[in-house]
Amino acid sequence: MTDTTSKTTAIQLLRAYHDNIQNPDEAAALFADDGVVELPTVKARAQGREAIRGLVQGLLKKIPGFRFKNTQVWIETPDKVFAEYSVEALVPDTGKIYKQTYAGVLIAEGGRIKLLREALDTAEAARAFSKD
C-alpha cells in the first residue's frame, strides 16, 4: 500500500494518483477509507477504496494505455489543488484515440485523497467510444 502521511499535500497526492493510474491497487490506496472519485459529467461516482479500485480497473479495461500527462496546476493550497491534465490513448474496441482534457479538483485530508472531482468533454468521450 502507498505510504502517505498527514503532511502529504494535495498536489503530491494528485501527482501520485497520476503516476499510479496504471496500478489500480496503488491508485486506490491514495484515498481515504471513505474517499470519493466523482465525474459528474458522465454520472460516475465511486466511494471507498474498493469502489475506486474497481473504477480504475474498468477504465483500464476500456483504455489500456490510459495515462495522465501535461498537468497544469491552476490553484494550489496544502489541502486543495485544481488542475487540468490530458490523456491520449487508443480505445481498442473502436480503434479510435481517446483524446481528452480533464479539469480536476482534489481535496486532501489526513494525507489521503478525500475527494477527486473531474470534468471532461463528454462529446469527445462519446466519439472515442462510438463504433461507427
Question: Can you name each region flagged by the protein language model?
Answer:
Residues 1-29, 33, 132:
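Short, low-complexity N-terminal intrinsically disordered segments enriched in polar/charged residues
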Residues 2-5, 60-132:
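A beta-strand edge to alpha-helix "cap/lid" segment located at domain peripheries
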Residues 4-8, 46-50, 97:
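Residues at secondary-structure transition points
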Residues 7-16, 39-45, 59-64, 82-86:
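Short, mixed-charge, low-aromatic patches
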Residues 14, 18-21, 31, 56, ...:
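Hydrophobic alpha-helical core bundles mediating ligand binding, dimerization, or RNAP-core interactions
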Residues 17, 26-28, 35, 48, ...:
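Hydrophobic pocket/interface hotspot
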Residues 24, 28-77:
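A solvent-exposed, acidic/Ser-Thr-rich amphipathic alpha-helical stretch
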